[in-house]
Each structure stands twice: as C-alpha cells, then as structure tokens.
Design a protein with these regions (language model features):
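Pepsin/retropepsin-fold aspartyl endopeptidases
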Residues: 1-245
Length: 245
C-alpha cells in the first residue's frame, strides 16, 4: 500500500516490520497482518499488507506475491483485464510458452537463453511486472562473465527501486533472447553495476521487466510452479522509441 497516495484514506494498524528487498537495496517497512482484500466478487482473508512509500502519483498499491501465489491469474494486456481463477475451475492454457518457475529471495525465476557478443548464456531471471525495464543482467553475473566494457552503452540508466535506493545500469544490445520456443533479436538490455539489492544478488542472473513481459498475455499458476506466455498485440512494439527515431 502506498501511504503517499492522495486516495489513501484507509486506517490500518501496522503491527510489525519486515525487510523489503528492492532492486537496488533493502530497507525496513511497516507490515499489517490479517487483512482482507476484495477483488471483483472475491474476498480474500488473512493477507499481510505492507506500507511502501512510492511517489504520490504512481498508484495506490501493488498486488504482491502473498496474493498472487494463492490463485491462478491471467494478465491480459490485449483487453487490459486481470482474471483471477478459483483453483478448482482453472485449466492451464494451451498453445502457450509454458515455463517452470523456481524461487530465489522469495521471488519467481524463469529460464531464458541470452546471446551477448556471440556468447550464449543460460540464465535464471526474476519476472518483474512492476519494472519498466527490458532485461537487466545482475552485477555478479556481469562480473563473472567479464561483460562490463565489452560494449559501449547506448545510454546510462539511473534507477530507483521500492527501497528508495538508486543505482546505475549500462544499456547495451543483446544479440538474441530466447524465451521458450521464441527468439527475439537485437534486444536492448543492460549490464548492472548496482552494489546492493536484488540486482546485486548472486541468487539470480538478472531481471526480466515489464517492457519485455507486456508482449505476452501472462497466466501465473504459482502453486503448481508454472508461467504461461501467449504473444499478444504488443509483440512488435518498439522497446524504446528513441532507438528507432
């Protein structure tokens, strides 16, 4: 929940603190236990709410893994609709890219293959629909594979994560990204130089952001450990308009 939102008129009793692992660092935030969320005609009880001070005009809150992990759901970018399914009625979608999920630092990871400078890497990356990035390689992965300095960055990005810390990314081009049975060529990605937070972690190789993920309608079945990706009408959307101008 975003306490800075002008629509935050709720009154919640925060009863503990938890560590928030952001992309560029960590911080302690307030937590409230045993809350209820109404979504459409569904009422979900026993949820923990967190207070994360995003900028006031961003959003009122973020639906996180504590909810998403309880129900199969679909993010349909074609219709801009979120579908939440009862487990008893959920049928995995057909004709999609089905990827097995693993976990690190409490977040879901998927396998992808990336070619950089004609070198092929099999990576496990976090799926982060809250990120506006494309694909960032974590700092330890970049260092271990001696990637920093192998390309002249076409831009430098300075990012701020939910913990309010900042970091720097060197934007470069990846020759190819393979996701399931689909290949994407000359993809703008980044080498991380961040020294704290998720993007400095050795527990995963990188982060796949929503600038890539939005090209698929996404079905998440976290209880059974699968993500299903279906190409949508954003599949050929430019990653960054300034690269084609």
């Amino acid at each position: 929940m975003n306490p800075n939102s002008p629509r935050s008129t709720y009154s919640i009793q925060f009863d503990s603190q938890v560590t928030n692992n952001g992309a560029t660092g960590t911080n302690l935030i307030q937590a409230s236990s045993d809350n209820e969320l109404q979504l459409g005609n569904m009422q979900i009880k026993g949820l923990r709410f967190l207070s994360i001070p995003y900028p006031p005009n961003f959003w009122d809150g973020v639906i996180g893994l504590s909810f998403i992990s309880q129900y199969p759901l679909k993010l349909d970018y074609d219709t801009k609709t979120l579908y939440v399914y009862e487990r008893s009625s959920f049928i995995p979608p057909k004709n999609t890219i089905a990827l097995k999920i693993e976990y690190a630092l409490g977040v879901p990871l998927i396998p992808i293959q990336v070619k950089v400078n004609n070198r092929i890497f099999n990576m496990k990356v976090e799926i982060d629909t809250g990120s506006d990035r494309v694909l960032d390689m974590n700092t330890p992965f970049v260092r271990q594979n001696d990637l920093l300095g192998t390309q002249s960055p076409f831009a430098i990005s300075r990012i701020t994560s939910s913990d309010s810390n900042a970091g720097e990314l060197q934007n470069v081009f990846f020759d190819e990204v393979r996701l399931g049975n689909m290949n994407f060529y000359k993809i703008p990605g980044a080498f991380s130089t961040v020294t704290e937070g998720v993007q400095a972690s050795q527990e995963m190789d990188g982060v796949l952001g929503n600038n890539f993920l939005q090209r698929f309608n996404i079905t998440l079945d976290l209880q059974n450990g699968y993500i299903y990706l279906e190409p949508n009408n954003l599949i050929y959307k430019p990653f960054y308009h300034f690269l084609i101008e």
